[in-house]
């Protein structure tokens, strides 16, 4: 057995289906076994995949064992001279495996090989090549300095941004999405460390490879599609916790105790700061309208009080303790009433907006008339303090909905500007599918070989110009219309903003993902 391919799957059956078809094509003529370890998926992966891939060795776990442990399960079964650890949401070009194996033959000191990766839109994934996460490197990444100085050898060392992504290079760390390694090297350094549940296991493995005297190489002569990339959202608390917990484990394992303790303290402080900033950012992003409402209400009420005390009723001290309590009571009550009527829970309903504000204002005015006579001079303050924010908040909400509607409308219209890259037979199948799902309204036509019964808009080499000419926003690539290699090369030169989806001959789905930070989407072919 020359090659064993190990894939860990968790709830991405449609992506794995496309992956397996591409892997089978890439391994033609090579003595290969494919082992899939499923970490207790709940999406029906077993019943969907097993009938279509009879030669694949599936292992179905009863629990989510984690990435490292699942890979080790596959490794225990692997018989190949070389091992390829591969993510399920990838597509390989036809010559990828052969090129990688040939590269190993050129240098017997290569310990492991990573590869150039792009996302579903053809954008280079910078995690394809990385440096070791030293304390300084981790902090630069944590606080965003790597993003501010993307070409700096110092600040952007984590992603080795100073090295060209189109040239082969020796690197420190390979991405776990694609690692090819000789079985003899694994016998020498050991398997994945199962203490790493998610993140860090590839860093640890890469470190041990170098420590044993081998070299890690980034291979740019072939490019694969990795749909999700680092799919966990980088601003989420879960990502911050998992990533830097992995860094802590890495430091404890590979640094001496005294130095490790100091580094871990720094990392813990950095994690807390990053988590706090992330929480504030997410809170503001999620509750921007309520925050604006609070600011508007406070500003208008206090502005009204200031105006009234200086120009209308100068003899009244509106900032006395009792009056301040009354005013702030009305402010708080106004906010509570607005929230109670689901102002923020149903923020897309303009009728709900008016209803919540009107009811809140009426209730406050009713309460005002129940106030003692000796503070009736607050009438003007409360009246303007209620009506003015009501008007301002309504205008802001109307503008917010207007902008949101426009964005949604544009996205909907863009999705309909679709071209299908396929031969005539496959084009008809895809077109019928889109008609059933209501997505065929603006399918402009087919890209492929000339056919008198179904003349194409052009061939795949003309695709960039056709996209610009017709303002295409979505392309469905069918593998039988062109090779995976040609498709991957094409998406890398398409204009920005084009959404790509992929369909492999024989598969039952169309998959795609707009960027590395978004979950993928799919269409099922029935």
Regions found by a protein language model. Give the residues of each.
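A conserved acidic beta->alpha catalytic loop
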Residues: 22, 38-47, 63
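Glycine-rich, basic loop-to-helix element that forms the pyrophosphate-binding segment
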Residues: 60-78, 99, 461
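Short aromatic/hydrophobic "clamp" motif used to bind/position activated sugar donors
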Residues: 83
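Conserved donor NDP-sugar-binding/catalytic core segment of glycosyltransferases
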Residues: 91-127
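Short, flexible, basic/aromatic active-site loop/helix in glycosyltransferases
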Residues: 132-171
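Active-site-adjacent helix/loop segment of glycosyltransferases
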Residues: 207-283
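N-terminal hydrophobic signal-anchor/signal peptide
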Residues: 275-308, 343-348, 396-526
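Aromatic-rich membrane-interfacial microdomains
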Residues: 338-419
């Amino acid at each position: 057995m020359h090659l064993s391919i190990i894939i860990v799957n968790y709830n991405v059956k449609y992506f794995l289906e496309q992956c397996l078809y591409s892997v089978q094509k890439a391994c033609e003529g090579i003595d290969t076994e494919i082992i899939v370890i499923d970490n207790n998926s709940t999406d029906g992966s077993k019943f969907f995949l097993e009938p279509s891939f009879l030669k694949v060795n599936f292992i179905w776990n009863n629990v989510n064992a984690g990435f490292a442990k699942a890979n080790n399960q596959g490794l225990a079964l692997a018989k190949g001279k070389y091992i390829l650890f591969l993510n399920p949401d990838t597509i390989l070009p036809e010559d990828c495996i052969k090129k990688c194996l040939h590269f190993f033959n050129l240098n017997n000191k290569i310990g492991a090989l990573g590869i150039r990766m792009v996302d579903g839109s053809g954008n280079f994934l910078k995690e394809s090549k990385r440096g070791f996460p030293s304390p300084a490197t981790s902090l630069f990444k944590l606080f965003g300095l790597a993003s501010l100085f993307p070409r700096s050898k110092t600040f952007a060392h984590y992603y080795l941004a100073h090295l060209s992504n189109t040239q082969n290079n020796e690197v420190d760390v390979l991405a776990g999405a694609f690692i090819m390694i000789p079985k003899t090297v694994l016998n020498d350094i050991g398997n994945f460390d199962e203490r790493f549940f998610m993140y860090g296991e590839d860093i640890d493995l890469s470190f041990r490879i170098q420590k044993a005297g081998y070299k890690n190489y980034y291979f740019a002569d072939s490019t694969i599609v990795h749909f999700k990339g680092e799919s966990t959202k980088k601003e989420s608390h879960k990502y911050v916790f998992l990533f830097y917990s992995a860094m802590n484990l890495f430091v404890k394992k590979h640094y001496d105790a005294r130095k490790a303790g100091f580094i871990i303290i720094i990392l813990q402080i950095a994690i807390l700061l990053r988590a706090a900033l992330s929480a504030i950012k997410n809170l503001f992003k999620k509750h921007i309208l309520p925050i604006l409402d609070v600011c508007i209400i406070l500003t208008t009420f206090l502005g009204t009080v200031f105006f009234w005390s200086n120009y209308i009723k100068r003899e009244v001290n509106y900032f006395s303790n009792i009056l301040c309590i009354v005013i702030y009571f009305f402010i708080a009550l106004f906010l509570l009433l607005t929230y109670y009527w689901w102002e923020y829970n149903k923020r897309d309903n303009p009728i709900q907006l008016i209803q919540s504000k009107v009811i809140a204002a009426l209730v406050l005015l009713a309460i005002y008339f129940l106030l003692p006579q000796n503070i009736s001079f607050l009438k003007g303050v409360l009246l303007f303090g209620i009506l003015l924010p009501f008007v301002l908040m309504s205008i802001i909400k109307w503008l917010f909905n207007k902008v949101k509607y426009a964005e949604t409308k544009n996205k909907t219209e863009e999705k309909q500007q679709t071209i299908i890259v396929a031969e005539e037979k496959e084009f008809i199948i895809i077109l019928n599918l889109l008609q059933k799902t209501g997505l065929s309204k603006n399918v402009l036509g087919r890209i492929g070989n000339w056919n008198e019964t179904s003349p194409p808009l052009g061939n795949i080499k003309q695709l960039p110009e056709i996209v610009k000419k017709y303002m295409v926003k979505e392309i469905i690539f069918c593998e039988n219309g062109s090779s995976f290699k040609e498709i991957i090369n094409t998406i890398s030169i398409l204009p920005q903003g084009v959404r790509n989806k992929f369909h492999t001959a024989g598969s039952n789905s169309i998959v795609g993902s707009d960027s590395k930070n978004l979950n993928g989407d799919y269409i099922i072919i029935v």
